[in-house]
Amino acid sequence: MEKTYNPQEIERKWQRNWQEKDAFKVSNEEYHKKYYDLVMFPYPSGTLHVGHVKNYVIGDVIARYKRMRGYNVMHPFGFDAFGLPAENAAIEKGNIHPEDWTMQNINIIRNQIKKLGISYNWEREVITCKEDYYKWTQWIFLQLYKNGLAYKKKAPVNWCPNCKTVLANEQVVNGKCERCGTVVEIKQLEQWYFKITDYAEKLLYDLEKLSGWPENVKIMQKNWIGKSVGAEVEFNLDNGKGSLRVFTTRPDTLWGVTFMALAPESPLVEELTTPENSEKVNQFLQRVSLQDRFKRTAEGAEKEGVFTGSYAINPVNGEKIPIYVANYILYEYGTGAIMAVPAHDQRDFEFAKKYDLPIRIVIMPEGDELTEENLEKAYIGEGVLVNSGEFTGLDNQTAIREVSQWLEDKKIGKVVTQYKLRDWLISRQRYWGAPIPVVYCEKCGVVPVPEKDLPVKLPRDVAFEPTGKSPLIDHPDFKETTCPKCGGKAKREVDTMDTFVDSSWYYLRYVNPKLEDKPFNKEDVDNWLPVDQYIGGVEHAILHLLYSRFITKVLKDLGYVSFDEPFKNLFTQGMIYRNGAKMSKSKGNVVSPEEMIEKYGTDALRTYILFMAPPERDAEWNDSGIEGTYRFLNKVWNTYMKIQDKIIHLENKPNYPLKNKSEKDLRRKLHQTIEKITSDIEGNFQFNTAVSSLMELLNELNSYLNNTDDKDWNLNLLKEFSEDFVLMLSPIAPHISEELWKNFGKDEFIFKASWPEIDKNALKAEEITLAVQINGKLRAQITVDVSLNEDEVKSYALEDDKVQKYISGKKIQKIIYVPKKIINIVVK
């Protein structure tokens, strides 16, 4: 055996051994005491940097630890392989197909992952762009379509002029495309949607079940779903040609409505604009269409609008009120129309001031007298109703309930629950995605592709030009087809599905990745799901996690699975920064894992990633840090080389004698560390303190070895210590641990060994340290044998030199002893 630590050689050896022996395989029949450990799969856009590596290492420590605790661990990996970057690469480079670009990157990343020693069961790999996967993504679409949960409609959508495709609301961040940062425009297009709004209440209510999720993620989902209870009120148009329906959470302010406002995107604008106002309205709409939708509706943005020429009638008092188009109204929220109460809503107040519209106070704060003349901003607090007909004098909270009931009684409104959540827009005008499995027949209309004809395959020979239309439009062999219903001529849907559809169910496919006649076997997924531990970035809190919860609930309702939440526990890891910024090629601050592995070894890289900060927090990369973890592992190696030959042939003895205090202290420290690291991993994955504890423990061992003549070493203690230490190290640094374990003559892989047991007796201290107070002030500390009785402890305290200094020549009135904690001596 090598006497010098050579991490690269050791790591290649054990990675080869694991692969040859299929070490991490688990069968579906091993679901008894199961543990499904899953890290969010990556998009294969290129090579990984150490920022990507963090969550894979976290997931691997958990997987290896759980195996040692006796669990059958499913720990699969795959690739979220459809998406724009592959298609953009084809457009930009002109000589590579998106599939080829994607598969090249997958091979690169797969090799990188294997060099990290991650214990994945590669037989379960899924790749979402392969036909054997997206066939079942299409199957899921068909199940939603058959059950009224997938539909097509024309609506204003978010359009990215750079990516040349539509975006779901969740993919727009501060008015910009989440992927490329381009300002998003609004277009009216026919698109496919999933009816996630049907599940809004379930998605909200079931957040309470998720006790193993971070609170901030649950709050983000709750806010995105955005439940509010209020009243829906009908405002008839004064021309008698219909009505405007508005939603309000403040029906108590109905008597303060002085105008109505429509979102610029609302189809009602065209209907309600009179001929004499059409030029002004169209000019306004043109100008607003160029504005960032989210900036224009932000709190401090300037409020602008134009009069449509139409009026509505306030149903509570019969007043005729003007209808405006206003830039601060969002079409997606509510009904796209609002009743404006300038006295009690700040945005309405600013608009009314600008256009000289009436402001009527209908809520008066108690003990104060507001007037329209002295009102400098909207009053939004609690108060008593004024100028509100029969409800005048009620406090506004009571009025909300009573006015809502009155509206229902008068049949001019009703109490409704509304959600900010909008249906999931899944159409994409791009090639590299799963084709939507429907055809359009002049005779039969929209016809779903029969399940037996799946998958609807992507053709390879397409032209990659970002025209704003799907490249599949110009592919006659793909587009032209026959109707599965009548056999006549038909055209295929040429849009593809949002890639979040692919990732909304992949955790199910891992259970049966090669099944050909269905996406998964119900019995198998019911045995293995929900995922016990899911690991990934908090940036997926709304998109991927919400969609996955939705799809799981749909599949449960349709009888395909027996659980309604996909992920029992969720851990969101922090990012790794360098030079104060997130790692990216454009910033030139990327740290390559290959370079670190070549220089320091995989185990040193893994150990540093875990040691640098609590795993949920962001951390700054520092080269000296990995140098430190390399030195630690080198010290582990050298220490084991020092003692190995003396203990290798020893049998493990359960109750060996400890000859002196240093041996007792070392064994106590060992079992304190087992207790601490077990707690660190079981509690909240505090791997940084686990690594720190191992470093401290190694120092204790070396202190014992250096301060004891080697002929006096307690070899039974060293045998127990060295085995338990390497067992605790193994989830963190598996390669060096496997090598040292083998050197102890062990035949099985170390992760198949049991996690060290805590000896509670070893934790008991033989000495205790007590605080000594004199007249209530701390004056000394004494260390005494734990077996001393109260009188002996008191005598020991009185003899202490520091205590003597404060009691000499004084009368002791009493001595109070709190066992194992404190002695208080009262003197006069």
From Swiss-Prot:
InterPro entries (alphabetical): aa-tRNA-synth_I_CS, Leu-tRNA-ligase, Leu_tRNA-synth_edit, M/V/L/I-tRNA-synth_anticd-bd, Methionyl/Leucyl_tRNA_Synth, Rossmann-like_a/b/a_fold, tRNAsynth_Ia_anticodon-bd, Val/Leu/Ile-tRNA-synth_edit
Renumbered ranges of motif 'KMSKS' region: 582-586
GO CC term (a single one): cytosol
Motif 'HIGH' region in this chain: 42-52
EC assignment: 6.1.1.4
Record carries keyword DNA repair: no
Pfam family, one: Anticodon_1
GO biological process, alphabetically ordered: leucyl-tRNA aminoacylation
Main location, first listed in the record: cytoplasm
Reaction equation(s) it catalyzes: tRNA(Leu) + L-leucine + ATP = L-leucyl-tRNA(Leu) + AMP + diphosphate
Residues that span the membrane, as ranges: none
Keywords for the protein's UniProt record, in alphabetical order: Aminoacyl-tRNA synthetase, ATP-binding, Cytoplasm, Ligase, Nucleotide-binding, Protein biosynthesis
Residues noted as binding ATP in the record, renumbered to the chain: K585
Subcellular location: Cytoplasm
Single annotated GO MF: leucine-tRNA ligase activity
NCBIfam families: leuS_bact (TIGR00396)
Family statement drawn from the similarity comment of this UniProt entry: Belongs to the class-I aminoacyl-tRNA synthetase family.
Name of the protein in its database record: Leucine--tRNA ligase
Organism field: Petrotoga mobilis (strain DSM 10674 / SJ95)
Lineage: Bacteria, Thermotogati, Thermotogota, Thermotogae, Petrotogales
